[in-house]
Structure formats: C-alpha cells, structure tokens
Amino acid sequence: MDHKEFLESLVCPRTGSSLTIAEDGNTLTSNDGVTYEVGETGIVNMLYPKELLPGDAREQYLYDQAFLRYDKGVSWVFETLNHSDEAATRQYFIDLMELKPGMKALEVGAGTGKDSALILDKVRPGGTVVLSDLSPNMLKLAQEKLSTEDVNVHYFLGNGSYLPFADDTFDAVFHFGGINTFSERKRAFDELTRVVRPGGKVVVGDESVAPWLRNTPTYATLLKANPLFRAEVPIEDVPANIENFKLHYVFGNAFYIMEYRVTAKAPEVDIDLPIPGKDFVDNWRLRAEKAE
C-alpha cells in the first residue's frame, strides 16, 4: 500500500463515509464538507472531534510537551516495577498480535515508536503498518526513527475512539499505555474491534495494579503516588463479538495486557433448548422465570 492507496483507504472518522482527495493530495474532504489535512511529511490529521474533549486535549498537550524525555521516563517506571525487562516485555506484547510477514497492522497511541519498531519487524517483508497518536510531536519523532525497509508505514493523527477506516481493515490492532485516560473508552474498544477482520487479534494494555497486591505496603505507596495505577481493567468495555479473551499482568503486576480474537458476530445462547432426559419441559428461560 503506497501513500496514495493509504489516503484512498481513509474514511470520515465521524460518519464512515468516503473522502475526496484534492488534486494536490494535500487535503481530504468528507461529504459534509469537513476537511482533513495531509502534512508535509505525509502525516494525515484525522483527529475527530476537531476540538477534542477536555481529557483528550489535556493528554495531547502533555505528550506534546514531554515527547523528548518520554522514553526515559517510561523506562524508569518499568525499572521500578520489579526491575522488569522492558525490551522482553514489549516483545511479548507484540507476539500476542500473532503477526506474519505481509500482514496489515494498526497501532493506536504509537508514541515515539518503541513498540512500532517491533510491529514493523513482524510484518516484514511486504506488510503494512499504520501508526497513529494524538500528539503531533510524538508521531513526528516516531516517523524520524523508524525504518521503512521492506515494509509500508503510514501515519495519522487520530482519536482512538473515532478511527478513519472501514470495517475489517486490519489483521491486528495494538494499543498500550493510554486507554485509562480515553474520554470515550467504550467507544474506543468498539472501534479497535470494528477495524479488525474476523479471526484477527486486538491487544490492549495500561496501568492497573493486580487486585491481590493493592493492600500490600509497597503497592499501596504506588497507588498513592500515581492514581492511574488504581484503574480497574476495563473488561466491561470489551465488545460482545470476541472469543479467546485472555488477561495478563505485567511489569511487576502493575500493568495489564489483554488479548482477544475478533469474531463475525456475538456468541449466542439457546435459552429455550429443552434439557434432555426429563419428563417435563425445562430450559434456561423457565429456570430464570422460576427464580424471579
């Protein structure tokens, strides 16, 4: 997928309708007149809403200010957590995506590209990786660092709750480190799942101290120092059309990573199927009615 093909694959993040590419290739316009700009380095500004919700705007500002020192700060956090092996753990995350050469992957919240580099390695040769972030400065830094040898790489500024792609576009989607602060988290999970083909993988993680550690002295200190570690794993936000859900605690059990496989539809339960071997009708529905 070259740059022109990437632009042609983008849809309106609000409506999902097609976009018209200007002759000079510098803008994309929706049917209702909303314009999205293509930057000089090819980064497409697909942010929606144009004026971000307060929480998302705050995160964008913070990351834009911290982009040069961000990697050192994150590595320090992981080092404090049971002296975790950051490189090995990040590789473990990407392995969960089950990528192969030639596949197409999306990373939401790519940051400076640490995990992105591992994703690129997995789909080489011939694969396509699309990287997005809220922060222009973070994404520009990733673009400067990452090698495009034997792989197609495309970048866009985007809100993970409004992805500019058609259904079933990717083989896998990855996000780590920001879902706790998403203003529309449930919608984000719906979007991350929607753009993955049936059978593909979604891998998501962030801060959340494991329940069995929260009352221990050391972790109680951690919870006071950074309220984000108090976040609960957002299992309730996961869509219905998934299977093989797994949850792992990592980085000293202070972060989680979840993985699941996308299905074409939600599972079904036949609550009216009669229980065999009885001389009277019995099923789940009747048992529920009796329990009321």
Task: Describe these PLM feature segments.
Residues E8, L47-E98, K114, L118, K201-N226, ...:
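Conserved class I S-adenosyl-L-methionine
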Residues K104-Y162:
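Class I SAM-dependent methyltransferase SAM/SAH-binding core
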Residues D171-E184:
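A short SAM/SAH-binding and catalytic strip from SAM-dependent methyltransferases
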Residues K186-P198:
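A short glycine-rich, Lys/Arg-flanked "PGG" loop and its adjoining helix->strand segment in the class I
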